[in-house]
C-alpha cells in the first residue's frame, strides 16, 4: 500500500504527534493527502520542553491543528517504579488519553508514526498500540526511517535531519525509581549540552547524583576537548559527571 491509498481510505484521523521525524512526516503526509487530521501532543514529565516547542512550531508551519494534553505520567506506580515494562505502560496510558481526547473531537481513528524499521522486540510500546487498535500507516506502507528522512528532505522540511531523541526516562536504568527532580536534572543537564553546541548525546543517570555523558563519534572529540567546561556546567545537576570515552552509536 502507498500512503496516498491509505489516506484515500482514512479520510479523517487523530495523529499521535511527538514532533520527531516519523510523526512529523505522518502529519505532513496527512496534510498533503488532504486528510481531516488533528495532531495530539501529550506533555508529561518524560518530554523536555524543547520537544513541545518544536512540535508546536512544526504543526503551525503546516497549518495543522494541534491539541496539547498535559498528563502526570508519574502518577502511575508501574511507570514511576521504572520496570522493564515501563514503555508498555507509558504508551498505553498516553494512547488511551489521545483516544479519549480524539473521541471528544469526533475522531474514531488514531494514527502513530511507527515505521517499517522499528523492531517490535525492542519496542514494548508497540504491543500497547497494537492492543488499542492504533494504526501505523508508515509501517503499513513499508516506509523505513531512511526513506522517511529522504522524503522529508525532498519536501524541504528541516526536520529531515533531526537527531533521534528518546524520552527522558530512557536515561535512567531500569529499577531506579523515576521522580520529577531526577528527570528535571537530566533535562537541565542536556539543555546545558545543547547550549554548548552539541546536538546528539545522552546524559545517562548512574545514580541520583552521578551522570555519564555519551556523545556520537562526530562530537566526542569536541566534548573531550571541552571536558572541564562541560563538567562545570552540569555540576549543578549531578555531583559527579563523567564523559564516556566510547562513542555512542548514532541512531538512524
Regions from the PLM with identified roles:
Residues 180-201:
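Short amphipathic alpha-helix segments
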Residues 162-182:
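Internal, active-site/partner-interface "lid" segment
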Residues 144-145, 149-150, 157-166, 199-200:
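Short, structured loop/turn "capping" segments at alpha-beta junctions
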Residues 249-252:
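Short, low-order "capping/linker" segments at domain edges
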Residues 197-206, 244:
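C-terminal boundary motif of the adenylate-forming
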Residues 1-154, 195, 211, 228-238, ...:
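ATP-dependent adenylation/nucleotidyltransferase module used to activate substrates
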Residues 86, 178-181, 222-226:
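Alpha-helix N-cap and loop-to-helix initiation/capping positions
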Residues 207-225:
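A short interface-forming secondary-structure element
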Amino acid at each position: 500500500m502507498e500512503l496516498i491509498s491509505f489516506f484515500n481510505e482514512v479520510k479523517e484521523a487523530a495523529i499521535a504527534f511527538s514532533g520527531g521525524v516519523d510523526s512529523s512526516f505522518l502529519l505532513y503526509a496527512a496534510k498533503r493527502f488532504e486528510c481531516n487530521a488533528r495532531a495530539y501532543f501529550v506533555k508529561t514529565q518524560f518530554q523536555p520542553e524543547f520537544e513541545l516547542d518544536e512540535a508546536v512550531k512544526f504543526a503551525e508551519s503546516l497549518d495543522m491543528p494541534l491539541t496539547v494534553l498535559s498528563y502526570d505520567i508519574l502518577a502511575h506506580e508501574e511507570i514511576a517504579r521504572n520496570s522493564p515494562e515501563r514503555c508498555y505502560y507509558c504508551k498505553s496510558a498516553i494512547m488511551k488519553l489521545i483516544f479519549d481526547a480524539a473521541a471528544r473531537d469526533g475522531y474514531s481513528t488514531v494514527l502513530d508514526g511507527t515505521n517499517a524499521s522499528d523492531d517490535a522486540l525492542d519496542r514494548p510500546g508497540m504491543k500497547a498500540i497494537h492492543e488499542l487498535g492504533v494504526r501505523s500507516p508508515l509501517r503499513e506502507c513499508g516506509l523505513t526511517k531512511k526513506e522517511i528522512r529522504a522524503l522529508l528532505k525532498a519536501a524541504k522540511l528541516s526536520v529531515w535531519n533531526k537527531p533521534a531523541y528518546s524520552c527522558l526516562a530512557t536515561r535512567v536504568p531500569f529499577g531506579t525509581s523515576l521522580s520529577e527532580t531526577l528527570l528535571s536534572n537530566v533535562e537541565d543537564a542536556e539543555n546545558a549540552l545543547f547550549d554548548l553546541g552539541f546536538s546528539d548525546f545522552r546524559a545517562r543517570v548512574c545514580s541520583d547524583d552521578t551522570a555519564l555523558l555519551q556523545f556520537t563519534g562526530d562530537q566526542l572529540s569536541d566534548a573531550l576537548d571541552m571536558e572541564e567546561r562541560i563538567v562545570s556546567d552540569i555540576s549543578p545537576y549531578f555531583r559527579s559527571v563523567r564523559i564516556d570515552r566510547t562513542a555512542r552509536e548514532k541512531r538512524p
